[in-house]
Amino acid sequence: MSYSETQLTALAKNNPKELIRIITSPNSDVHALTFGAEILGGEVADESLVLPALRQLLRHVNAVVREGAMIGVSAFYMEKKPPQDVLDRLKKMSTDDPSPACKDLANSLLEDYNK
């Protein structure tokens, strides 16, 4: 099933566990995964819900989904650094990710978190 950004945002606000189920499901489309990760990081405040989903999506096979997960990390961790394992994953992505856009975004996030 495909979801609009409006639907994903409504889920984040009203039923974040359902949003997480959707974006961690292997059958979800790239659009739902990407925008769902971004929305999750920006709309849901419970780290115990957000962090496991973003950790999973940072390792997704699709570069667009990984980029969305990084945007979600950036949105969720605006006021503090992410956990060390997420920083380690970003560091690995900044050098080893096959996508130049993902490498650049990972580098940018690491620079921001090291200020």
Regions found by a protein language model. Name each.
Residues N27-D29, V61-N62, P98-S99:
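Short inter-helical turns and helix N-cap capping residues of alpha-solenoid HEAT/ARM repeat scaffolds
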Residues A10-T24, A45-R59, K81-S94:
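Amphipathic alpha-helical scaffolding segments comprising HEAT/armadillo-like alpha-solenoid repeats
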Residues M1-A12, H31-A45, E67-K81, P100-K115:
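Structural detector for internal amphipathic alpha-helices that build alpha-solenoid repeat scaffolds
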Residues E5, H60, L90-M93, D97, ...:
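A generic structural signal for ordered secondary structure
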Residues E18-E38:
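A short, compositionally biased N-terminal segment around positions ~18-40 that is enriched
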